[in-house]
Amino acid sequence: MNNTLKYWKEAATLIVAARTSHGHFPYIQPQVQFPNQQNNTSDYEVLLLKRSQKSGFMPNAFVFPGGNIESSDFSSDWIKVFSRYEQKPNFGLGLVKQLDNRSPMFTADSSKFGSLIPGEVATRICAIRETFEESGILLVVPENFNSEDNQHLVEVTDQDKEKLSKWREEVQRNPSQFIQMCKEMRCMPNIWALKEWSNWLTPVISQGVKSRRFDTAFFICCLNAKPAVSDDNKEVTSFKWWTPTEALEDYKSHKIWIPPPQFYELSRLCHFAPINELHKFIVNRSLEGCERWMPVIAQCEDGIVHTLPGDDLYPEDPDLTGEKQTVVCSNETIENLIQKGGRFHRLVLIDGKPTLLVNIKPKYKHINPLTIESESKNKL
């Protein structure tokens, strides 16, 4: 774990997509239109957790399970748990092709911080541990598991509920207990089921104003069936399984609030109706990697624009630290900025209503979000 971080903390989150049916649903016309979406609804749902009102970061938001990377996620005690894979590159995860624009949480030499656990492994351990703490879903495999057999939808193994409940409380109190739990249960966190999806760095809100920031690795996994879920009544107050379209509909109608990264990623998922197609996509690009995105905010006359790398408004060399960079202010309307044309990779917020405008080519074999038709877009 990189203890030299000054401006943000490192975190990991997990998009849990679970099959809801082995057949096909009849097509239901959604209220929110996605122009390229197939004419059937998803046969899977995504888990979103509601953060506590008392949370110091994004209170009341619906987010994917996840949290801070702890020193125990990098503990060399994991070597014994993963003994079968110690000699394989990244414990059998393989080597990601692109390294230039990746976050240091992946590329930094963890041995310099006294750890034998690669960042690729530790971030996945964190995502699995936090998912267990917040939702009760435990993604583990037996100690004799063959990672090469992990190309299918994940099966969540039934465990003794009382035993798991006790371990969950232990891990919530002390994250290092996750190691002890795996040793006693003779299992391993199923790091091979988690495929790298994206990487978001909390934007700088304004110069001189300190706010909580996180460099967050987003992983995704596809489950063959929805597992049992229970909130922790601490950081998480409720949960819900949604199809990506349904979650965005509820956000559009102000029933829930979804932060920009989750909004963007749910919009990406709208490309995939069958979970098998989603799973095939994430497996095929699993070693392509991704670049870290930090939104740069532009304040316009009539709304806010979150610009992302590749957008014509995005700075060539953004100040990630926030020591120099301020929020960009413009005396133009959002419509005027759009009419100028060019490359768009931005999230527009007018009266709290979101619109994604994206016309750039995605990198690393990824996919752009399907743009949402909302009232704010009708104003443009």
Curated annotation (Swiss-Prot):
Residues bound to Mg(2+): E130, E134
UniProt GO cellular component terms: mitochondrion; peroxisome
Function: Fatty acyl-coenzyme A (CoA) diphosphatase that hydrolyzes fatty acyl-CoA to yield acyl-4'-phosphopantetheine and adenosine 3',5'-bisphosphate. Mediates the hydrolysis of a wide range of CoA esters, including choloyl-CoA and branched-chain fatty-acyl-CoA esters and at low substrate concentrations medium and long-chain fatty-acyl-CoA esters are the primary substrates. Highest activity seen with medium-chain acyl-CoA esters and higher rates of activity seen with the unsaturated acyl-CoA esters compared with the saturated esters. Exhibits decapping activity towards dpCoA-capped RNAs in vitro.
Swiss-Prot/TrEMBL site (Important for coenzyme A binding) positions: R51, F57, R212
UniProt keyword Metal-binding, yes or no: yes
Enzyme nomenclature, EC number: 3.6.1.-, 3.6.1.77
Domain Nudix hydrolase, chain residue ranges per copy: 8-264
Motif range (Nudix box): 115-136
Swiss-Prot/TrEMBL keywords: Hydrolase, Magnesium, Manganese, Metal-binding, Peroxisome
Name of the protein this chain belongs to: Acyl-coenzyme A diphosphatase NUDT19
Family per similarity comment: Belongs to the Nudix hydrolase family.
Motif placement: Microbody targeting signal: 378-380
Phylogenetic classification of the source organism: Eukaryota, Metazoa, Chordata, Craniata, Vertebrata
GO MF annotations in UniProt: coenzyme A diphosphatase activity; magnesium ion binding
Class of this enzyme: hydrolase
PANTHER family to which the protein is assigned, alphabetical: ACYL-COENZYME A DIPHOSPHATASE NUDT19 (PTHR12318:SF0), TESTOSTERONE-REGULATED PROTEIN RP2 (PTHR12318)
Gene: nudt19
Organism: Xenopus laevis (African clawed frog)
GO biological process terms, semicolon-separated: butyryl-CoA catabolic process; coenzyme A catabolic process; malonyl-CoA catabolic process; medium-chain fatty-acyl-CoA catabolic process; propionyl-CoA metabolic process; succinyl-CoA catabolic process
Subcellular location: Peroxisome
Catalytic activity: an acyl-CoA + H2O = an acyl-4'-phosphopantetheine + adenosine 3',5'-bisphosphate + 2 H(+); CoA + H2O = (R)-4'-phosphopantetheine + adenosine 3',5'-bisphosphate + 2 H(+); hexanoyl-CoA + H2O = hexanoyl-4'-phosphopantetheine + adenosine 3',5'-bisphosphate + 2 H(+); octanoyl-CoA + H2O = S-octanoyl-4'-phosphopantetheine + adenosine 3',5'-bisphosphate + 2 H(+)
Cofactor: Mg(2+); Mn(2+)
Subunit organization: Monomer.
Keyword Magnesium listed: yes
SUPFAM superfamilies in the record: Nudix (SSF55811)
Cited CDD domains: NUDIX_AcylCoAdiphos_Nudt19 (cd18870)
